[in-house]
Amino acid sequence: MQGNGYYDGIAVALGTNAALDLNFDKGATIKAHQNSAADDLFAVNLAAGSDLKVKGDIDLISTAVGGGTGNNYGIYSAGGDAAFDGMRLQVTGGKNIYGVYGSSGGTFTFNKDVSIIAEQAQGYVYGVYLSGNNADFKNLVINANNAEGSDACGIFAKSNSVVQIAGDTEITVNVGDSGYDSRAVRIKDAEISLAGSLQAVVSGGQTALGILIESDAENAVFSTGATGMTDISVKNGSDGSYGLAVESFDTKKVTADFNNAARIDVSGAMDVFGIKGWGGATEINFKENSLITALGTEGNNSTSSTVSAISLEKDAANVGGTITFNKNVLLQATAVNKAQISSGLNIDNGVAAFKGAFTGITVKSNGENSYGIINNNGGKADVEGALVVDAQGQDYVFGINNANGSKIDIKGVAAITVNSANTENAYGIYSTGANSDIAFNSDTILTTNGLAAVQVEAGGKVLFARGLVSESGAYIFAYGSDSNIKINSEGGGLVKVLGDIFAQDGGTLDFKMDNSESYLEGAADGVNMDMQNGSVWRVTGDSNSQKLNLENAAVDLTTDGVGTTKFAITDYSGTGSNFIMDTDLAAETGDKVNITNAAAGTTYIQVKDASLVNGHTVTDAKNLLLITDASQSANFVGKNFNAGGLWDVTPTLENGENVTLTNGLQGTKNDWYLTKLAKQVNNDTKVLLESGDGNYALWRNTGDTLRKRLGDLHNYRDTKVESDGIWSRYIGGKFGSGNFDGSFNMYQLGYDKAANAKSIYGFAVENGSGHTSYSYGSGKDKLFAGSIYGTWHGDNSSYTDVVARFGQFDTDIRSYGDYPDKAKAKSHAYSLSVEYGKTIELNKAQGTFIEPQAQVIIGRLGSSSYTTDRGNNVYMGGVNSCIGRLGVVAGKKDASGNDVYLKVNMLHEFGGNRDVRMLAGNGETLSESQDYGDTWFELGLGGNMKLGNSSHLYGDIERSFGADIQKKWQVNAGVRFEF
């Protein structure tokens, strides 16, 4: 079927009240064509009251060529009804193009899938245009292409039209660079509802719009079904690009309900909005997870443009609209261009509700002003779940900006990150104006590279009901009458703040910390502090606190390292807490605390004195004023202090009534003075010092005598026959002093060769380990050593034994004091031993004998230098040792050559001095000498047993008495084979 025309070309036409039924069971093609300057072209034209029914799927084609100036209609109805099955509709050419056009009432019904192609108009292109009509579709596909004309729109429903799409909808709209507007869906005083998914792709024109909903004379409604997904992509509007735009011109309501998951992706070179709403009668609802992105692209660097994921703006009555997200949502605004304003969420008197478990907002801009959230003129934002905001920009950047009576309530955990190329203009959270309130009801993490973490002005308020972590060094500031910031107001939150805090010109700042992991590091002015349960304030400059309550907490004035920090308190209360103060008692200078009013209670004073660094000892009478309490109510007591360096320091504090000043006058009851210092090494330092004791003790206790090494060599060996030997032995035991307990295990293997019947020369290697336990630490030593020796036997049962020994210690040290530490150290050791002895038979028949012995061991335990994990530099000087031994062995030997014996030795260390120097990471120093010189006795029991003609077993057990370092017990057991 085909209709051609030079004026009005029509393929199918029904007059007023006419009816026509067409049955195309096998399908049909209906064409309307014009090829000259006719007025209008119609494939189907229905007059008022007419009724057209078409059975079967059809192709409906309407083509205008040759520069026709009339409109081109695929289906035209001026009040008639039409019902179709499936349809492929193509409308091409003409002035204005309409795929489906309806006016003045009437209904379109499509029982099967419909695809509409409308393209190449000189003016407008509409896939579906309805004014007062109803239309029902199944699945609908529209392609509206107007590359040369002015406007293009997929569906335009107005004037009480109702459109229902039972299946899925796909709309593609394109307008050329010279065109005006491109829209996928436009609703004005009408309703469109979709049961399935929506995919809309829009590009080009001055203004590109995914969905535009307007109400003027009647309500306007758009809704999607619960199945599928809404996916809207809009790009390249030269003046503006919008994913969803809603506007109410009067009191008539605009409603947009997205009942399925939604993605709105918008990009353009000028103004770019994912969602934009105008007017208080607008309402937008997202029931499933949503992603809204706005991208300002390169190509237009106008500094007047705006990029926003969501923007709700007020109308002439100063009322904004409402948007609600029932599940998770991610808002992204990126300005590659030089946008003047970039925002994730912009509310101007509107209301935004986020009811999902997660709300994410990301803003990245090359432009001037960037906002994660900007809430103005009485706007309201409620976030029920977690909130994550990341805002980055070039100049003014705000994580949250709240102004002019607006309110934000965040119930979940919040994480806010702000970065600006101009750090002076980066604000994490900002609230200004009376009744401008922000409430964080759960824990908050705040990160900014700028100066301001939180700032309120002119009556603005920010409440952190729980914890706040802000460790970027930015300040927290309440300025102006009725401005207020509360931190951890409900208690129990983790508070970690690095940065100064201020309350000035009528502003108040209430800061609470109530657990041992909470801290503040910064200066303060005019704040109210409540500190409990091990929390710490590390003061970094002169400060004053309007109120300070300390309950088992600490204020540390030493952090700034100045040594003269001033700290003023108007109202002080507390007990069981500490002030930690820098002092130089020798110079009588230090930090100062000034209290106006105080409640009764005891506060402890700990000091970090300069003598810890310069090594001076204060011996003269000194009076250093530390505290002035004008109320004379509080009590202050000195308490020992470990600053994490080398020393524990205990100060003596005295009230001024008990102090005579250097000018001879008596002090006053208001004042408290530091008068004395007592210092001792702290528990962690003791471990470092005592670790050297363990090395020395292990080296000394593994020293040799001939009997220990080779047994009764000169008695069981046939001195008339040359013989070589190989041997091995085990040495183990325990040792200790009043400061430590140690144990060790050593294994030794040796070989010797006979130069003649009375002389042997050999070498040995040994490997072992020791473990040392200290009161507040432990040490593990690994020792690898080697030795060479020579033994000479005389004709009168005497012997001379010379041993040269050398070894290396590898030591692991751990401390478990107030500041646990660990280190690795390495040192070398050397010794030369000369021993002489003679066996004297007492009764040959009984086999009894005695053996006087004398020995000298000269050696050196080398120095070691190391740095602990906490930055303490340790130099452990070497030890020059000279040990002399006089001893006697008394025993009994049987006929086979086996023997048992008792031995007694007296030993003396003639050397044993070493120097120790330490420099802590915090500057504290220590220098001392250690002296291992001592006299002690050893008592032992041993024996030798022949295993055969060329082998024997030997061993002994011994212990020492009388020395500071004692050998609690030691076992020595070996076996030797000769060949």
List PLM regions with ranges.
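Short secondary-structure subsegments characteristic of cysteine-rich extracellular domains
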Residues: 615-633, 742-758, 873-881
